[in-house]
């Protein structure tokens, strides 16, 4: 009867067997590297059902693929390897890698995963706690911190860029001060707390006829209870500051500029902040975004608490070419622009020119022709002045030929005719 009651505790109302979460394996002290001869304690925390057995087995321990003889909740170990545990009816726990060293100097890092925004603590430890002097910490071969004697190195708010290989060096007095000694390199990985957010529009059914934007992201499974806040921006202007809601309703007056929106997700302490790419509407290609040329959106790098993103975003202009329009210009006629691509300082195209503009263009044509002829004469004059400076004798010979252009030009503004006055350049 009691056995039946115990089994019923594991069967929910749906009739399906309950799925138990895997147990949590912890290490004390919390360092993955120890000196030879030292011992550490492993503890397995999980669900332990009350089974009516004479000798209930509540915990299983594994070293690699070998089953250890102990069935206690905690065990002491000193052998290197990969440890796991399992409770009755639950999956196997995540592993803990334990290293044992016989060096004079070891670098100890936490066994548990370190997530973005959390402190990352490392300890450079001398043989059986001897004091380490002239202590240096290295990240991927570069010195990042110096201490006079034994001190932990702490990164207050870890970032993905803090991942890599760490090492330490220093001296010890055994009994006199030794030469600098180096620890082995240790790999450290900073886990992503949540993914880079993506801004999307809700379907008309979900939005109930409105235009609603949703900032979507996903937390790491081990941190799924971490609260996040969201902010929405239009260009670089915040339209809704950080709040718990992941949705924002766009005003009707701004619906035409949806592609200028982006969002940001952050923890409540703002220790981790990540911005989304610009909103991409279905069926449209990438929008002109000058900011992305200097900082690719793919990284969507996490912003610091004080960072203010800038935007140089412009409204896109259609690239379809249907016809060619001739646009008059006060300084040069005949400039050709594809229809819809007339010169403009704003995002909207100019309106078609009226018939009076065409008449104005015809009136300006003689003046433009006159200006072109004057420019040709001035070009010839300047070329001869330059030739005279370089070779006066050659210029003297050219001025005696009947084809020599005149060097003095006057223009009668009343007519489009050009009056030429004879003259010559003295060599």
UniProtKB/Swiss-Prot annotation:
Residues 23-101, 103-189 form the Ig-like C2-type domain. Residues 401-427 are annotated as: Disordered. One of its GO terms (cellular component) is endoplasmic reticulum. The keyword Kinase does not apply. It holds the Pfam family Ig_2. GO terms for biological process: negative regulation of immune response. Disulfide bonds join 44-85, 124-168. InterPro entries: Ig-like_dom, Ig-like_dom_sf, Ig-like_fold, Ig_Fc_receptor, Ig_sub. SUPFAM superfamilies: Immunoglobulin. Expressed at low levels. Expressed in B-lymphocytes. Detected in spleen, lymph node, kidney, lung and brain. Coiled coil: none annotated. Residues 401-418 have a biased composition (Polar residues). The keyword Secreted does not apply. Its main location: cytoplasm. Induction: Up-regulated upon cell cycle arrest. Glycans are attached at residue 152. PANTHER family: FC RECEPTOR-LIKE B, IMMUNOGLOBULIN FC RECEPTOR. This is Fc receptor-like B. It comes from Mus musculus.
